Each structure stands twice: as C-alpha cells, then as structure tokens.
Amino acid sequence: MRRLAWTAFLICAFCSPRPAAASGTLALHDCRLEHPLKVTSLAARCGVLQVAENPAEPLGRTIGLHVAVVPALNRRSRAAPLFLLAGGPGQAASDLYVSYAAAFARVNRTHDIVLLDQRGTGQSEPLFCDYPEDWRETHDELPALRQATLACLARYGERVRYYTSSVAALDLERVREALGYAQIDLYGASYGTRMAELYLRHHAAAVQAVVLDGVTYPEQAIGPQTPLDGERALDLILERCRYAPECAAAYPDLRREFDALRAKFGPGSACLTLPDPSTGEPLELEFDRGVLAAALRLLSYNATQASLLPALIHQASSGRPAALAAQTVMMAREIRGQLASGMQNSVVCSEDVPFFGGVDRQRLDATYQGTEQLDALAEICKLWPKGPVDTDLHAPLHSDVPTLLLSGEADPVTPPANARRLAQGLAHHRLLVLPGEGHGQLATGCMPRLVAAFLDARDAQALDAACLEEHRPAPFFVGSTGPAP
C-alpha cells in the first residue's frame, strides 16, 4: 500500500459505427466495456490494431492495441469523434470512460467516442509490476523497491523502453487512420493532457478542438513540483474550512491539530490494527509519515474526498488515526488496480526524471510529502530502460486549435498555474477554474454541458459559463454523520 504513496486517481446497445468510421480498415465487433470495479458494463464496438512494438523495426515483434468506439446516438451526425486520453500515466482510456460515462453523455449524442488503451495499459499489452503493498514494512525501503523493479524487468525485458508517450502518439495517429476519421477532437485528463499536447504538436491538421482537464505543460518535468503543489492544495482546503462556519465551529483548532499530527508522525510511527476495508479481517499497519502523506494527497484529489479531511485530521490528532488509515488503504488499492506501473515507469523514467535538474530538497522536505516520491523514482529509474522521446517533447507548444482548459483551484497535482503557463502559446483558448475543486473537472456541476457545447461550436470564448458561478464544492463533514444539515 505504501508504494502508492508516491505513484499516484449505463447500458446502451449499438449496431454499427457511423459511416466515417466504417470507411476505415480496422474491423470492429460488438463488445462490452467493464467498469474497473466490476459494477457495470457498457456496449461498444471493439477492435485490435496490430502495430510494431519498436517503431524502428516494423517487421519485428507486434503488439495489439485495444480500440473501442462508442458510436454517436445520432447516427447522421457528422461531428468529429472525441478521442479520450487517460491519466496516470498508466490508466486505460476504456477504464476512464466507463467510470465517467455519464459525464460524456451529452457529447456522445453527436460525437463518436473513441477509446484507445494506450500501449502498456488496459488491454493493450499492459505492463503491471508486482509492487507489494507492504514493501515499506521491511524498513529497508529502497532495496525492496529495487528488488521489485528488477523482478518486473525480468518479466518484461528491455522491450519496456518502447512504451513512451512519443511512441504512443504514433499509435494514436495510426488508430485515427485505421478508423477512417479525417479529423478528430481530443479530451485529455491529467497525464492525458501531455499526450494531447504531443499529438497536437505533430498532427495539428487532424485536430478540430481540444479539451484539457487537469493541465500539464510541455516544459514541465513532473515530480519536483508535486510536493509543493500538494502543500498548496492542502492549505486551500484547510483555509476553506476556516471560512466555512460549520467546519470552523466543529474544528476551531484544525491548523494546530494538523501541525501537531505532522510533528508526531515526521520522525515517529504508530502500529495500528484495523478492520481491512475489503474483507473486515484484522489488518496491521504501521502509520507513519509516508502513510500520512499518502492519505493527505489522495484525499485532496477532489472536493468530495477532501470534505472528509477536517474530521479525519481531527480524529488522528486526537490519537485515533484508524479512520484516516482505512481511507488510505481503500484509495491506494483502487489506484493500484487501475494504473499499469510498468508503463508508468517507462514514461516517467524517459520523459521526466532525466529532466529534473536541480532539486531544492530542503524546500521539499518542508512539505508533508517530502522527498520520498522523488527518491523512489530515482531508484526505479536507475534500473529502468530509457525509451524514445521526441526532441521537442519539453519545448513550448504553440497552437491555433480551439482549446478549452479546465482546472480546479485546489488541484494537488496540476494547479491552475499549469494551465495559465500553457495558455501563453494558445491562440484560441479559454480557462475555466472551479473554486475549491481538485483534480479533474469534467463531471463537476454543469461542466458536461459546457464541454459538449464547446465541441459542437469550437468557440471557447462564446461559452456561457454562468452556470459555474452557482457551483459550490462539497460541504465538509462535521461529524460521523456527514455535513451539517
């Protein structure tokens, strides 16, 4: 479970894809897309596109890319299809869609939705490493991480180097051609915004409109800034509690309690026995700075989860950290099952860690996350093969394609400042920032309607976003029963 402290977040029947897709060369068949937690499944049309694992050796080993098309409900619509680019890195586009299908329902009225499980994820030659939940319990952390990484490489070999974003962007273009689409729209979430920017840089003529949700910008090497962004987000959450009358009344000393909690579990730890959230069986857990950091970061990801933080911090500071620990176990397990950690290693070790430059460790150590994530990444990347990366991957992006940027004010990993940085090179864009919200805005409030309207008109400035002024983040829990009535 501790490994995830640094890693890391409707049924409809269809007959056939619309004519634009039918003109392609990729054969599709009826299929169902299953929710990652097995709670539902959706109908689609699926196919497998065979591509070279190493693009420099077209006659070498091939892999199958899993592609799913959810046809537009209006079969006569000629709107461009929307390609979904998932986050992580390591999440499958099919998992993203099934989890948020309701948020895409308006778009799907007139747009095909295309789901390419990026190479190394989902059903496209997934690369999962067996990093055990308890690798930190050896108290010999980095050697245990090295051992698990070497075991993963023994399973997959040197070929993991061919699972970078630059190679995946070539796959995306091949899928577009194989489906017969002349032009497409892009929706990228979190790491998926990097993929969208990379594709847009090299295939702008094929893109009509772009939605970026939880924005990265090309010049950014993801890693060193993450603890600082997480600290900023947590400060905003605690400050929001201070100005919310019910929360402030329930937890008048929340900041002091939080500071005391950090001081206690910085150098120290507590051995807990709590009911396993999945089985109810007794679960032994060493609660220390790493578990606390994982809890705070994961709970900060969206305002609904963040609504629990004041109550959980209060309980933990009062000597009852079990509820906070249980939340961490549940969220970490869910993420662990959905992120292909080997693919994540291939991306981060090739595209981010080599570009870290100077890291102010003293500044990072002052945050609740500290430098543990960076140390773990560095250890993995000493061993992990480096793959092909475009020379302009980290160059500024300049584009005149209509682009809608979505940010949460309290996003712990991709704050609004990222979107503002990217926007400097976008000729036709609009940034929507939701107060109090965290990572990923597509399913928030009236945002599904706004995204659909943007993709139909491709004019971000003309959007009437007044509905967002009525939105409020989830109220804080002020007791075991929930928010104040």
How would you describe each model-predicted region?
Residues 1-7:
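Bacterial N-terminal signal peptides that target proteins for export
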Residues 18-21:
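Sec/Tat signal peptide C-region and signal peptidase I cleavage site
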Residues 320-359:
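Long, low-complexity segments enriched in small/aliphatic residues
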Residues 23-291, 346-485:
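Gly/Pro-rich cap/lid or specificity-loop segments adjacent to the active site
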Residues 7-16:
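Bacterial N-terminal signal peptides
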Residues 216-234, 312-317, 321-333:
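Flexible "cap/lid" loop of the alpha/beta hydrolase fold
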Residues 300-314, 318, 354-359, 389:
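Short helix-capping/linker segments at secondary-structure and domain boundaries
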Residues 275-294, 301-304, 334-342:
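Structural motif
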